[in-house]
Amino acid sequence: MGLEGASGAISSLCLPGLSQFTWLQYRYANLLQPSQFHGEPCNFSDKEVEDCVTSRPCRSQVRCEGFVCAQTGRCVNRRLLCNGDNDCGDQSDEANCRRIYKKCQHEMDQYWGIGSLASGINLFTNSFEGPVLDHRYYAGGCSPHYILNTRFRKPYNVESYMPQTQGKYEFILKDYESYSDFERKVTEKTASRSGFSFGFKMPGIFELGISSQSDRGKHYIRRTKRFSHTKSVFLHARSDLEVAHYKLKPRSLMLHYEFLQRVKRLPLEYSYGEYRDLFRDFGTHYITEAVLGGIYEYTLVMNKEAMERGDYTLNNVHACAKNDFKIGGAIEEVYVSLGVSVGKCRGILNEIKDRNKRDTMVEDLVVLVRGGASEHITTLAYQELPTADLMQEWGDAVQYNPAIIKVKVEPLYELVTATDFAYSSTVKQNMKQALEEFQKEVSSCHCAPCQGNGVPVLKGSRCDCICPVGSQGLACEVSYRKNIPIDGKWNCWSNWSSCSGRRKTRQRQCNNPPPQNGGSPCSGPASETLDCS
């Protein structure tokens, strides 16, 4: 474990009225080697801040033609003073009012999930961070928006928030004859996008994955990874429920005052440490469009040899699972019409409920539920296949507590405009440069390989191994399975080459670890090329 020292920069914290100005100066350190396998993590801060005095003048600010808020520094239109809303974010627009002229006479709710939609998102970890947009700012607007007889107030930043009609709860079932197929088509969709690299622009709307650092992410990895390079087959079922579509205004956004002040304090002289702290606290991107709702998915892991002994096919399992949800096992004739005997279907369904038997067909039931957070629903979901009643209960909960399941995003630096910030082009360019450094620093490629197909996760200055069920130890080195195939994993990207012919390139190697004992090679490109100038 080690930190590399680096020089810092000076950033202004100007106090008007003094002959000299108080500034802050910083220095920071980069992570050279994370700790792992019980090594000591870095036990000191990777940055230092102290006051300094200089005769350098304060950085100029964007001129405000309206009212300058006392604490937040926000510039608001004077027509918003004394209207009963906290337009400043610090109530200074409502101070010293002889009379309050309330724009809204009735209480109105906030849109479901609107707080998360205003947050920045770290796409390297799929985690929501601090607020970058102010979705409690209405600019005096008060037209009610009715959804299911509930009156909502539309924030100034929001272009549209459209409810979606709740349809039937239907599962789409797909089967996979090997873990490698299952991982490529299913598991990798839930992973965070730590490897994206096309200028940090994400084209189109995409599904938001599960953070491998979250409890749910770790649980899912442990339960599914144990079946890598086994003779198991997989039946994956998924039901999507959309309750609302969200779209942000394309321009003239009201930034959250905390984010506004942090960006104003960034040094114009490039210093990675301060920009890194911004990404840590506010994420790497912000959401421009989103689908809110829920995803209910489960995976049945079946023992292929046990299925053959019992004269079962994957199609039999597929038919029994699909139709048990529809009829709840009540109409025996339906199974016969599917070409599956009642006894066969009962055998499969009973094994799902009692997975403590030895040498059974059903090796595991792995469930992942997003949206409709409820301890009661989650407990039921992890015990058995979903029923119509459970899905109805889950759907009702999703309506009022939806998850953000799909997003369209823009890099955080796109919020830095000349409307709010002086020297915006300089700050924006610094943020672009820092984002590339940040991606390198937080990548788990810095971790030593975990054994037994364990998954390394870098958190802070420490690497941990998420071990498949059946493996344990700091490096997943204790396992009942011997000489198993080891899948290859990528090492870190090299630095970009210098710009030549308006192109630059970088490479990486599949050696962390390399494939062993017939394991799968790394997926994805070994080199990348980008335009440059």
Segments from the language model and where they lie:
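Thrombospondin type-1
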Residues: 1-75, 86, 90-103, 358-365, ...
